[in-house]
Regions:
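Intrinsically disordered, low-complexity, Ser/Thr/Glu/Asp/Lys/Arg-enriched terminal regions and linkers
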Residues: 1-186
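Preference for solvent-exposed, low-hydrophobicity sequence contexts
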Residues: 41-46, 110-331
């Protein structure tokens, strides 16, 4: 979710791989079969929602690729499911991983282990109950990197840069493949010049993924409560759009929920940058590579904690459109 394989950061996604990816060292994006926007790069803020999203994706996979359809005597040929588990494996992260593995019940488990034993997960089928017996193939791989004493070492990657590159690759899709956009500077300039889509404000509802927004009766004030913290903020209703402007939002169709729960987050069809808001005309201006035919069905913006990379806000000779003071227009 922090550095997912085939989507921008913040997503939990089910992606169908039909051919080998030639080079995993560069960002490779694929349109997922189904995706849910968690809206953050770590599950620490809300592990329960994270797990529910994982379970929804897994249930969808079982239903679509294993269960027989109406009129079929047996299910489709089995499609293998490879799960990239989270890297947070201490404390609550470990508990979440155990719950995930018990729900999914994998047939194979691959662990990459290093010489610092305290950083490894327990050996064996650590997630099973004591009286539970399941046939699981365990595969352990030693780290390929070793020091002068033949001890495995970890190579720290710049996670922030990897996330920025994924966002770069995603919004690069706003332009034709033969369009010359190879650097953050070029993409920033191209996005500034790109004509945005117009989306009526009246059509859109906003779902805040990691805070609760409540309206006070007889008052033009909103109470914003940040989940998993004790922080709350009072925001005038007239200024609530400032939280959306210049942000990355998920695009969703409210009727396309991933479960029957009224609190379930609908499937996400893509991301957009809110380029500007004209309050007097009731219009959002958004930049997105999502096709117009899909965008026309969108009636829900999902606001998480994803940030526009700083490199896309810095264009020499231009005032960043996402940080201007006059982007909210009122009559």
């Amino acid at each position: 979710m922090g550095q997912p394989g085939f989507t921008p950061p913040g997503f939990l996604a089910l992606t169908i791989i039909e051919k080998q990816t030639p080079d995993l060292t560069i960002p490779c994006l694929k349109t997922p079969e189904r995706s849910i926007l968690y809206g953050d790069t770590s599950s620490k803020r809300d592990p329960r929602t994270y797990l529910n999203n994982v379970f929804s994706l897994y249930d969808y996979f079982r239903k679509e690729f294993y269960a027989p359809k109406e009129g079929q005597k047996r299910a489709k040929p089995e499609v293998p499911l490879v799960i990239n588990t989270p890297g947070w494996v201490k404390g609550n992260g470990y508990d979440a991983l155990v719950e995930m593995l018990r729900y999914i019940a994998p047939t194979h488990m691959v662990q990459v282990r290093i010489s610092t034993e305290s950083k490894n997960l327990p050996a064996g089928v650590f997630w099973l109950e004591e009286d539970q017996e399941l046939s699981v193939s365990l595969i352990e791989i030693a780290s390929a990197r070793r020091d002068a004493y033949n001890r495995s070492v970890t190579i720290r990657k710049d996670a922030s840069l990897i996330r920025d590159l994924k966002i770069f690759a995603y919004f690069r899709q706003c332009f034709p493949s033969d369009f010359s956009v190879d650097t953050f500077k070029e993409l920033a300039q191209a996005l500034i010049a790109h004509r945005p889509y117009v989306v009526p404000i009246s059509k859109i509802k906003v779902k805040h993924l990691h805070c609760q927004v409540k309206h006070f009766e007889r008052a033009e004030t909103l109470l914003v409560v940040y989940m998993s913290t004790d922080v709350f903020v009072l925001v005038p209703s007239s200024e609530i759009f400032y939280a959306l402007n210049g942000s990355i939002v998920g695009l969703a169709v409210s009727s396309a929920k991933n479960s029957d729960s009224e609190h379930a987050t609908p499937w996400c069809v893509g991301l957009a940058i809110v380029r500007g808001i004209d309050v007097s005309k009731g219009i959002f201006y958004v930049l997105t590579p999502v096709p117009l035919s899909i965008l026309e069905k969108v009636d829900l913006f999902l606001q998480g904690l994803l940030q526009i990379p700083t490199r896309l806000l810095q264009v020499p000779g231009c005032l960043s459109p996402y940080m201007s003071t006059n982007v909210l227009l009122q009559s």
